[in-house]
Amino acid sequence: MSLQNMGGTFLSNLITRPEFLAYTSERIFEQSAFLSSGVIQRNSALDCRAGGTRVRVPFLDYIAPTEETITSGNTWGTSGAGYLTAQNVTADEQIMTILHRGFMYGTDDLAKMGSGADPLGHVGNQLAAAIAKLKTATLIAQLGGLFGNISGSGVLGANTVNVSGTTTATSANYLTAANVIKAKNKLGERGSELTAIAMHSNVAAYLEETGYMQVQVSGTSLSSASGLNGVGYNTFAGLRVIVDDQLGVISGGTSTHLNKYPIYVFGSGVVAEGVQQELRLETDRNKPSFQDLLIVDYHYGYHVNGTRWAAAGDNPNNLATTGNLGATGSWALAYQNAKNVPLVRMLVNTPYDTGTYA
């Protein structure tokens, strides 16, 4: 007997229910390691629900007062006149650009009848993971613009530690605890604020091979002998591990040199998320073409604390071209010193990729 679509409940019957939207939003949180690790945190001060294309948040920079010696007389102090001199607190603003993103899927009745399944239901089952992946790609593009090329040409380039080799590599060029200490030291005494580390699976594989990966379970840690997908979450050098293959080889390497992988070390909440319009899921029926449509859109922005959007326009894409997220010229430093931003980039090699730049 041939299979046919006998009706029933399809995703289009469920998508408009608030429970499904809440479920999808919760699943996005679970699917995104950057969210669940605390690297990205919602900040209502960055919301733009009343309208606009960017969010401006005034702030006061870290203070570094000049201490004055007080003595008896009328010539002490930096004034030389026997009184304390008022010092300025640097005021500036941080700017986040709003991103407007969305996509749509469609299927016709013949596809349903021919397969006996609901293709849009298949999309719905993978929706949360797909959105989490897309938003991670946006974050990675933004980080690329902030740090710049291999030499660190971006506003956070000073927070780069390049331990990679050239045509050969040893363990000194891989991700090790010693190299993490070098990364933390970029921030000086504030290095202890770093809580999570993100890397490609080729980099993580070396940690697994050497037994450096630990699995954190209910306040205890166990050696990770069974892989990266154990119960709980993985840690290395006291940092929560995020593995994402979108953190691929950084471009621009010298010909014949070994591939270099970027690793990002984050402080908790260093990436803030503001929302203009929450995730929207809608369905529509195109009757003349016998099609059901699933429409997804979301309007938000990511902001790395201590930086600001500096391009003239808004709603950029992920490219590294002028005015977009991946361009170094799109960003400026709001803090006076990059060291005050708890975010460091490392560049390493890995024995699990011996490829070279062309």
What is each model feature region?
Residues 45-46, 184-188, 229-231, 282-283:
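A generic local secondary-structure boundary/capping motif
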Residues 57, 90-152, 188-201, 241, ...:
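Long, contiguous amphipathic alpha-helices that act as assembly "spine/axial" helices in icosahedral shell
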Residues 2-40, 162-178, 209-358:
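Sequence/fold signature of self-assembling virion shell proteins
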Residues 2, 57-60, 110, 357:
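Long, position-biased, composition-driven segments near the start of the mature protein
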Residues 63, 203-204:
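Acidic glycine-/aspartate-rich tracts in secreted/extracellular proteins
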Residues 81-83, 87-90, 121-122, 129-132, ...:
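Glycine-rich loops and low-complexity Gly/Arg-rich segments
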Residues 107-189, 318-320, 324, 332-351, ...:
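Alpha-helical scaffold segments that mediate packing/assembly in large oligomeric complexes
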Residues 35-101:
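Assembly/oligomerization interface modules of large self-assembling protein complexes
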